[in-house]
Amino acid sequence: MNTMTTYSGRKFDPMQMTPGDVYIEDIAHALSLLCRGGGQLTYFYSVGQHSLNCAAEAKARGWSKRQQLACLLHDASEGYISDIIRPVKIYLTNYLAVSYTHLRAHETLANL
C-alpha cells in the first residue's frame, strides 16, 4: 500500500481510494496551493480559484445547483493526484484512469 498523508493528517492511497476516503478540506487546501498551467503564468492562479470561478460562472448563467457543484468539483481529483498539463495528460492513460476514478468518487459524494 502506497499512501500519502493529507493536509488533515489522514493516510490516503490514491490508487485504492473510495468515496469515504475523500475529505473536502484536503481538496480545498491542496487546490488553493496548486497553480494552473504548470505554473507557467505571469501571476499565481490557483486551481482552487479556477474552480470557484467556474462555479460562479455557472451560477451567473442560471445553471442548476447540481451543475454549479459539478463545475466546482471538476478538478477535485487534482487535490490528491496533482495536475499535469493537458498536452502531456492526454498521453498518460493510467493517469486519466486514476483521475476518472477520483472524479466518480467525488461525484458520488456530491450526489451528482
Q: Which residue ranges define each predicted feature?
A:
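Conserved alpha-helical "signature site"
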Residues: 1-4, 36
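N- or domain-start disorder-to-order transition segments that initiate the globular core
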Residues: 7-22
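Alpha-helical scaffolds flanking conserved acidic
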Residues: 24-27, 62-76
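Active-site flanking loop/helix segments enriched in acidic
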Residues: 28-46
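Alpha-helical phosphate/pyrophosphate-handling elements in metalloenzyme active cores
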Residues: 40-66
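Active-site-flanking alpha-helical
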Residues: 77, 81-82
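Post-HEXXH active-site segment of zinc metalloproteases
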Residues: 84-96
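Conserved small/polar residues in nucleotide/adenosyl-binding loops
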Residues: 101-110
